[in-house]
Amino acid sequence: ATTEIYTLSLQRRSSDLVIQFEIPDEGFILLPSKLYLGVTEEYTETHNFVPFLEGKSSVGRLGIDIHSTAGKGDAGFCNTWTLEISVKQPVRIYSGMPIGQLIYFEISGEINNPYDKKKSAKYNKKTIYPVESMMYKNFK
């Protein structure tokens, strides 16, 4: 699994620098006070659903949070999910380790502006890698 970690303080008005690396077979120890970006192995399309991302309870009991604020997706989001991972204590993770689950809620009615059709959508580019914050695009 590919993971990223921010190397500088976060800047909302510019692209932030991250280090990208593969988790080795022996695992990787996540440390508190760092923000890690991970990515799901699964690609999803949510045309008629609103997806919610939740951590698995066994992972939460290790002190791992898999999302900071982006636990809800948009109808029309078609991509892998970037995970915003932080930990309460040092903990070793492994590639392919099940850490989260998606829950889908069916939409009744018409979707007027699906995410994959929005001109302002910043995270539409299909990828198998974590995607760093694009907050800076809000200030152009």
Set out the residue ranges of the language-model regions.
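Short, small-residue-biased leader/transition segments that mark boundaries at the very start
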Residues: 2-14
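DUTPase catalytic domain/fold
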Residues: 15-140
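Glycine-centered flexibility motif
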Residues: 1-2, 63
